[in-house]
Amino acid sequence: VEEHTRENIIRIMKELHYTPSQTARNLSMKSSSTVGVIVPEISNTFFGELFSGVEEITKRHNLSLLYSGNDNDMDTDYKALDMMKMQRVRGLLYIPAVNYSALGVLDKLQRKLDRMNCPIVCMDRDIGLKCDIVHFDDQSAVRKAVLALANEGHRKIAIIIGDKENILSVQRFEGYLEGLKKAGIPYDEDLVFRGTYTRVSGYQVTKQMIAKSKQPTAVITCNNLLSKGYIQAVCEHTHGKTDMYTHIGLDEIDMMQYLGIPYNCIQRDAYELGHSAAELLIKRLEQPDETFQHMILNSPLVHQTF
């Protein structure tokens, strides 16, 4: 383009307050400066912390972020992936919606991801994808929680957990069984309470547990939303007290710290998860031919009431 033509175009653009379309720019460049992030629930504070960790890294590299939620639903997950492909994201940080491996459709998902033609880092849930992976060892973490409670003399340890199809539920339940076995505590299915990973489900399942004749002395809740529902139900029953059972929750709850209420938890640092995943993605962008990495993050038990 001749210089005077270019100057005229720029002048007209300024007069009209024209902003170039990022989508059109991506299409012309066949790539973008945008990193896609797909998580189960954007509103969950755990994933808000994860986003902060991701942004810490992407800002350093002048990359913008495009978020989407999959609601732990396969169809919604596919739509989110299609949208990311259409936007030609430069890389993708991804938490699979469901256990595609157990459902027999892992190959279909892998082909879909391969067609995106960008680096992908799988976060939080290891379902066997061929890509970089970073997650916590939830199985080991729940096993440690059971043993910590057993060391305090508890023999009736209940668990409030998500549905059987969820890969995290599978791993956490295995940790629960391993902990019981190592502590010499017989497994009792009456102490297993299943729901979905939501606050409402945690509340409903806890109400069911409280109403049972066979009562636990300790309870493990398997994510922050289940823990919030559990606390709500217990506080209703005890008129504001949280110590009806000895309790360990998976993930921190900021609210407890702000209220000054002691809270036992398995600390899964969501910020570190996002930070580490973004670092892996940047490394993959810089070294695309390197062997895939599998990173397992530590999740210590933080206890304040025993």
State where each predicted segment sits.
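N-terminal helix-turn-helix DNA-binding module of bacterial transcription factors
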Residues: V1-S33, I120
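Bacterial carbohydrate/catabolite-sensing allosteric modules
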Residues: R11, E15-L16, E56-L63, D82-G91, ...
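Interdomain hinge and pocket-entrance segments immediately C-terminal to HTH DNA-binding domains
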Residues: K30-S43, H61-L63
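N-terminal winged-helix
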Residues: V39-E56
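Short histidine/acidic/glycine/proline-rich micro-motifs that form metal-
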Residues: E41-S43, D71-N72, A97-S101, D163-I167
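Conserved ATP-dependent adenylate/AMP-binding module captured primarily in the ANL superfamily
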Residues: D75-K79
